[in-house]
Amino acid sequence: MKPIYFSIVIPVFNRPDEIDRLLKSLTFQDDNNPFEVVVVEDGSTDDAKQICESYSNHLEINYYFKPNSGPGDSRNCGMSKAKGNYFLILDSDCVLPSHYLSTVRKALSTSYTDCFGGADAAHESFTFFQKVVNAVMTNPFSTGGVRGRKKGLTRFQPRSFNMGISKQLFEATGGFGKIHPGEDPEFVFRAWNLGFKTRFVDGAEVFHERRISLNSFVKQIYKFGSVRVILNRIHPKYQSRLFLFPTVFTVVWVLLIVLLLISFLLNTKAFYLDFVYLGISLYLLYSVLFFLSTWLISKSLQIAVVSVPLMFVQFASYAYGYIRSSVKLIGVTNNHIEAKLPEFFFKDIA
């Protein structure tokens, strides 16, 4: 096998301050092997060109500007221009620990794979809400271990905020598709179809900052639920009941509350109340387990307390997107999905 030469591909859109922190973290890597950085500006109005140029004496860095066509196409652009034989895909809102490159290099040298993913973590400098969001987005009780876990409830799917792709795999698949969000699992599904393997690299975590408010969090999770329906239609053999859980969780919870309110408003002890109380008790138990696991992982009582209601918000947002897309795609063939839900696809550049 040829020596691994990393090309770090970073799409960026109107976030020069973020790319500055990421590039700075790359200058502190303890890996002594050469690597290149490829930054692809996706049609930004607030570009990062000067910031990238300021690192030219510290990093082998190449900057490209292109019209806005989405993060997937930007990654493809970067990989097509990169000179490495292994691409490390990162989001611009990530910061790397100093051991990241050496950990990945050691893992690939020991057990090579054409595609890997790593965990995301919260840095101590993150805001309180960012830490809460990270806790909810990585807790196995709210994600099934799909994100940032070696052992989840489903086959590990690398995510593009922290993802490695060999040049061979990129050339075989053609890179990421037009769907967004969801371009990363869709890419992984096509890789699996071609016989390529994926793996989780323990220790190759990134600090994923997620510049996010409650409103943007709700919108993001809504989109995740929406595109999951599309992914299930395009790649049916990779469907998992796990991705139905937030929707079932939310629908049953709403039903329990409605039944309880009906009984209260009618001032009667309905025959179903015992089942309602049992159901609510199970939800309380689940919330306690989620709280305890978050407390154990984050080692913060405050984060654990706030994460519980945010978990309910996450499930409800996901469920709304999942149900809405499911209804809109009734009777729609796969060839017409993009026409029916165009907001989840980037257009080709003419």
What are these regions (language model features)?
Residues K24-P34:
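Short, acidic, metal-binding catalytic loop of nucleotide-sugar glycosyltransferases
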Residues S25, E41-Q50, N68-S69, D91-P97:
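A conserved acidic beta->alpha catalytic loop
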Residues G177-Q239:
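Catalytic donor/gating beta->alpha subdomain of glycosyltransferases that bind UDP-sugars
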Residues F249-G331:
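Membrane-embedded multi-pass helical conduit in multi-pass membrane proteins
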